[in-house]
Amino acid sequence: KNFLINIVRYLPVSACYIISMTCSYFGVRFIEESISDPIENTSGAVVPILCAIFLHQTMSAWAIVVVVIIVIGILGVGFVENTGKTDLKKKLGKKLAIWAFAMPFCYALLDACGTFLDIFYVDDASSTFLVGVTEDTIEHMANCCYEFTFFFISIGILIFFKIKGVKLFSVADPTNEEAIAHEATLTWYQKVYLQKDKLLAALFETMGQATYIFALSEGEGIAAVILGAGTVIISVILSRVILKEKLSWKQYIFIFIILGGIIALSLLGL
């Protein structure tokens, strides 16, 4: 009973995280992961600003300088991404280019709002909105509420697709009749296996979320450095090695400016 109540009470936080991820998945279809991921991880720079505005907390002079550096990096990436050979407007059209490039920023803002709201839910078990939790269980309860909310939404979307007659787990080219005919002979678990890359991605995402909660609740300050900077570094490396993304030297300069700002902001929290 308490768990269902907590799912409802934690819904504002879950909504911020889930909608932010939806924005991320939409944007990554059109923008290189090497660019979108550093922008998305600047959500850590937005949280102190929200705390300063709504909780009247003060930011140190160094924190303000770092936030300004991150903003400069973001503006630089935005300028380079929309000029010269990397002009998104030429590749996608003006309207879609605006929507695509806005998605990483939407993710950063919504993720920051989710993190900000988490302060009211997991900071103190005696004053939390969640019921039936202790200092030892509050983070785990919050994580379970988020994961099950995501699960229930996925079930709802699955039912909606079935009603609309959308072909689930289809990988066949809709213009290739032979491929469509072959796919029709496959069993449901064979079709699911064809989506193994997405299943693996979902597994990593879920494990990452659990690790994120544990690291912040149980780890030392260095965890913030690893989480804030490590994800960006690994993402840029994997995008270059596996996805074969090639960026201009100007883009890399501004990306490393953002990365440096994220590392500095994490270190300030030590």
Task: Label each PLM-derived region with a short phrase.
Residues 23-39, 126-130, 137-140, 210-230:
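Structural motif at transmembrane-helix junctions in multi-pass transporters
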Residues 41-45, 67-70, 74, 150-153, ...:
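Residue-level recognition of pore/gate-forming positions within transmembrane alpha-helices
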Residues 1-23, 40, 98-108, 169-211:
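Loop-to-transmembrane-helix transition segments
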Residues 1-19, 69, 139-180, 234:
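Transmembrane alpha-helices of multi-pass small-molecule transport proteins
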Residues 110-152:
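Juxtamembrane helix-loop-helix junctions in multi-pass membrane proteins
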Residues 50-52, 61-82, 250-269:
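Hydrophobic transmembrane alpha-helices of multi-pass small-molecule transport proteins
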Residues 14, 18-22, 45-49, 108, ...:
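Hydrophobic/small/kink-forming positions within alpha-helical transmembrane segments
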Residues 24, 45-65, 214, 232-252:
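C-terminal transmembrane-helix exit sites in multi-pass transporters
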